[in-house]
């Protein structure tokens, strides 16, 4: 029976490269000269610490452009709220999403069931497996999910016949 898996994975080496490129650009930019701005990568989170909201937005723009250049979708980033840190600094934590959460898995299941195609979908840990008798139905599901904005960067892997 043909099947495929829906996953949302990010290559952490590419994330590390993008963060390092952003740090280099921040160090060289004229509008950041003499300012205390930090961007650090810790496991699945990027921490941004800087002096004001203007610089924070500029750093986030730099990060997003570096992510896009490295082939990482901006949907993989989940922004925390802006917090005041000590010494009139502002901090924001940006989480890098790995895997499909249970809630998003249920949402994907509902989207697939609404199509009335003869396919079954089931949530397995951090992925969703879709099986069906007809390969064309599975390809229709892939096209449908690519067209929907679910707030995740979805990849379709393990396409088996």
Swiss-Prot record:
Keyword set includes Nucleotide-binding: yes
GO MF annotations, alphabetized: nucleotide binding
Any Gene Ontology CC annotation: cytosol
Keywords: Nucleotide-binding
Top-level taxon of the source organism: Bacteria
InterPro entries tied to this protein: DUF520, UPF0234-like_C, UPF0234_N, YajQ-like_sf
Any Pfam family: DUF520
Function: Nucleotide-binding protein.
PANTHER family in alphabetical order: UPF0234 PROTEIN YAJQ
Membership in a protein family: Belongs to the YajQ family.
Protein's recorded name: Nucleotide-binding protein Geob_0921
């Amino acid at each position: 029976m043909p099947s495929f898996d829906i996953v949302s994975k990010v290559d952490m080496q590419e994330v590390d490269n993008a963060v390092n490129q952003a740090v280099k650009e921040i160090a060289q930019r004229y509008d950041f000269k003499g300012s205390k701005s930090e961007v650090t990568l810790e496991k699945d989170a990027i921490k941004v610490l800087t002096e004001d909201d203007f610089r924070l937005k500029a750093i986030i723009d730099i990060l997003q452009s570096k992510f896009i250049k490295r082939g990482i979708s901006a949907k993989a980033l989940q922004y925390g709220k802006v917090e005041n840190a000590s010494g009139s600094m502002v901090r924001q934590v940006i989480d890098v999403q790995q895997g499909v959460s249970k809630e998003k898995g249920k949402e994907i299941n509902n989207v697939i069931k609404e199509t009335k195609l003869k396919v079954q979908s089931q949530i397995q840990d951090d992925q969703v497996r879709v099986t069906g008798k007809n390969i064309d139905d599975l390809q229709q599901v892939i096209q449908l999910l690519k067209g929907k904005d679910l707030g995740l960067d979805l990849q379709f892997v393990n396409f088996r016949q």
